[in-house]
Amino acid sequence: MSKPIQMEKGVKYRDADKMALIPVKNMPTEQKEVLRKPEWMKIKLPASSKRIDDIKSAMRKNNLHSVCEEASCPNLAECFNHGTATFMILGAICTRRCPFCDVAHGRPVAPEAEEPKKLAKTIQDMKLKYVVITSVDRDDLRDGGAQHFADCNREIRALNPEIRIETLVPDFRGRMDRALEAMIDNPPDVFNHNLETAPRLYRKVRPGANYQWSLDLLKKFKDQHPNVPTKSGLMMGLGETKEEIVEVLKDLRAHGVTMLTLGQYLAPSRHHLPVERYVPPAEFDELKEIALELGFTHAACGPFVRSSYHADLQAKGEEVK
């Protein structure tokens, strides 16, 4: 029997090392037949550009992280060329170990006190008008990192008064009330928390998370800030059924959520959860129609849609696929 990995603080555990720490054992992609990508999933990635290099340089200069890079998002080049980025605060090491995600797991170091000011200045230098702020899970912090989110919102607005801020938050497991209280005076313009998948698949896909808890987080925030839109996203292709997704959409609407993203799951490596199915574009279109019929005001649904993909256009209600 192999010895458990002794995690060192500040060390990133990825791929096989990360998967070995998950209490629920999943069959990695390397042990299953890898599905061939259909034609609609084959895109030509844009070449590097000065805009991409400038954004990466600004991140490195200020010791900031983007979820675009840390999670190996397939839309990185497109978004960076568009002049948008999703900043990941509170470090690049997550206390969770979800087998679909490429963000590193481990014991994170203490939050950087100057990060909110650095983030605000970087956004000012980049002349952004809409920004998405997300974070790793920080179960080691008493408020899950909520005060750090609030501090970032405050500092960003101080230097960028015309900006719109979307926050994509973790579930603040076990500390929801404390987290919501920390953010009450500095809420975002859009509050986003992803359910990710159907409740039947939570044990496999989101070990340590709870479906109802996530719904309650969205509802409680909406109750506190009725004028701030709430948003959530789901991945397709993890073994869910269409009927299960429709039920999740109904649950989201029952908890006040009006903005939705649906996209195709792609395995970051052979060590992650395998893709069970590639969902055809027509099915995404059908789910979008269902979402709008259920009362969602915004629904971005398509194979390459991600939670923060063209978030500025989503917030304006423009078509995003």
UniProtKB/Swiss-Prot annotation:
EC number: 2.8.1.8
Protein family according to the UniProt entry: Belongs to the radical SAM superfamily. Lipoyl synthase family.
InterPro entries: Aldolase_TIM, Elp3/MiaA/NifB-like_rSAM, LIAS_N, Lipoyl_synth, rSAM
Gene3D superfamilies associated with the record: Aldolase class I
Keywords: 4Fe-4S, Cytoplasm, Iron, Iron-sulfur, Metal-binding, S-adenosyl-L-methionine, Transferase
SUPFAM superfamilies the record matches: Radical SAM enzymes
Presence of the UniProt keyword Transcription regulation in the record: no
Domain Radical SAM core: 80-297
Pfam family, one: Radical_SAM
Cofactor(s) of this protein: [4Fe-4S] cluster
Entry's Gene Ontology cellular component terms: cytoplasm
The keyword Cell cycle appears for this protein: no
Pathway: Protein modification; protein lipoylation via endogenous pathway; protein N(6)-(lipoyl)lysine from octanoyl-[acyl-carrier-protein]: step 2/2
Domain of life: Bacteria
Chief location: cytoplasm
Enzyme class: transferase
Chain's gene name: lipA
Co-factor remark: Binds 2 [4Fe-4S] clusters per subunit. One cluster is coordinated with 3 cysteines and an exchangeable S-adenosyl-L-methionine.
Taxonomic path: Bacteria, Pseudomonadati, Pseudomonadota, Gammaproteobacteria, Vibrionales
Any one Gene Ontology molecular-function term assigned to this protein's record: metal ion binding
Subcellular location: Cytoplasm
Protein's name according to its UniProt entry: Lipoyl synthase
Binding site for [4Fe-4S] cluster 2: C94, C98, C101
